């Protein structure tokens, strides 16, 4: 068996679906964004703001390649920008890859809700 890799745009449901599928299959779940934050000590948003989108995508790709090298088969939610990296494209060949789609309206609503939660988490009156 090989890893099951979920790809799609931000807000397409990779993390939510990934957790559910991993639980159903009895496999570990690896989330590219969470692994990046654990490795770097900061969020993807902060990396992009400080170093730019290319640096972010390079770091996301490095984290994803490490996850793909894990010997235990897992369900992996890939960061949207990471799957465009040439080394990641090559590494995904022959693996089980599922593209999650959502309508633009659904994506916008999910990203807006995520942005609200991120803002609320950092707002002094909410703490």
Label each residue range with its predicted role.
Residues 15:
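Walker A/P-loop
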């Amino acid at each position: 068996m090989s890893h099951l890799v979920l790809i799609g745009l931000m807000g397409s449901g990779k993390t939510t679906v990934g957790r559910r599928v991993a639980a159903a299959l009895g496999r570990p779940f690896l989330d590219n964004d969470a692994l990046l934050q654990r490795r770097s000590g900061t969020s993807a948003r902060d990396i992009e703001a400080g170093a730019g989108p290319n640096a972010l995508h390079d770091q996301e790709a490095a984290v994803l390649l490490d996850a793909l090298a894990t010997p235990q088969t897992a369900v992996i939610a890939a960061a949207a920008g990471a799957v465009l990296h040439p080394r990641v494209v090559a590494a995904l060949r022959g693996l089980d890859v599922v593209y999650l789609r959502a309508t633009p309206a659904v994506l916008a609503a999910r990203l807006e809700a995520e942005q609200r939660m991120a803002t609320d988490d950092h707002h002094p009156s909410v703490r």
